[in-house]
């Protein structure tokens, strides 16, 4: 063996160097594939992403090929340029060998208790009119009595039922919606947008795939509305009584938690 000049031998240095190179490639390889996928989804070239993230095209090429492992700050800059949500940013961070930056606890977790309290107050204050809490995939996480009555569900169903399933599957809700095509078309458009934002691995994308299996979903207009339209109305008939509604949507400001970013509180107002 030849001396390496620093007290070590070439024979002992080379395996370490090879191991380090393999670790670097492994850490960057998964990230590189994710970045390429997101660029394709956003219709961005490597050059455009480099310009948006203010990084040299050469360095970005090294990151995507696994020849360089980016810092946490660099990953977040790339995520900003790709307009990713907090959950998707965590995925990139982990792929680059960093710890997740943003919380991902469930709706009933301790870390979200203040958000649940705020949402619960809003739902209660909106009684007797319907109001519900949805995630990005349209899962109903919470609802007031007015909404549960409209859906024909009990509180034990919260967290398990999905608004898209209720609207598209044959049953009480679908049969009660007088302008079903208009409402379903809008909800499908909204779900598509969430799936596009969250990516093909998201729960929103899985729900979208399930909804698109309904034959009627293929024939809905890409986006309802027309001249003179302000909001998509909802006409709902139960036991011969017809009611007319429009909705408002509330989100949490300045979220630093993935689910907090995705939550919407939807309130129904009589017309």
Regions found by a protein language model. Name each.
Residues 40, 51, 80:
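Alpha-helical residues within the helix-turn-helix
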Residues 127-218, 224-227, 238:
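PAS-family sensory domains
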Residues 2-42:
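A short, Lys/Arg-rich alpha-helix, primarily the initiator
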Residues 35, 49-50, 60-63:
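Conserved hydrophobic/aromatic packing and binding residues within compact polymer-binding modules
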Residues 194, 198-199, 210-271:
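Amphipathic alpha-helical interface segments
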Residues 54-69, 79:
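Recognition helix of helix-turn-helix/homeodomain-like DNA-binding domains
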Residues 73-76, 80-113:
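Short amphipathic recognition helices of helix-turn-helix/homeodomain-type DNA-binding modules
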